[in-house]
Amino acid sequence: LKKRVPVIDQGNSLGFWGGKFGGNFVPETLKKPIEDLEVLFNKLKKDKKFINERDKYFKNWVGSPTRFIKLENLTNHIGGAQIWSKVVSDANGGAHKIYNATVHCLLAKRSGKKIICGDTGAGYAGKMLSMAAKKFGLKCKIFMGAKDIARQQPNVKAMKKNGAEVIPVYSGSQTLVDAVSECMRFWVANCDTTAMCVGSTVGPAVFVRICGWSTSQISRELKAQLIDEFGSIPKKT
């Protein structure tokens, strides 16, 4: 491993890892759309205009920075160290997944795609993606296991209210793993017009990098808030 380079950014330009555990294990049909997304993301994450656009929407739409507060009662109850909390639930939609969804929609707009698809289990990733898609004028398709749809009706209703098409998946266990597979199949068949948003740090390497890059907004805010509150970032003891 290279020193002082995050593990997530190591490997070659297309995310390939060599050595004993290396490889780019995706079906041949996924290779081209994944490589296209990798090239686009590697370019835009260094583009000052794109970063400024991202930061503008994070501030004026997502609601960054979110609060950093001391939990006075819990600190007094437990004693010893001060206990603080980063209130990420302050973000638009109430979940950290809004950062990833926002960046994916910005990438989709830059690539000229009109549709964005995504998978969801509990419904939060789907809800955030439906919100971002509505904000940026994209059609949104959310794949969700039939069992999860029955369990998570509030989030299903929220997605539909935002204009998303919620597509039930009846194959396999009818849960998230099957929704991911169906979403990927749809993306591969429609990659000329459609972008895909993976809701977490899973899947092909580029999706992991996009998610990490997007949600690192939380840690950037936290570092600034720590310095503002304590004068420096607390050291591990």
What are the residue ranges of the model-derived segments?
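PLP-dependent amino-acid enzyme catalytic core
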Residues: L1-T237
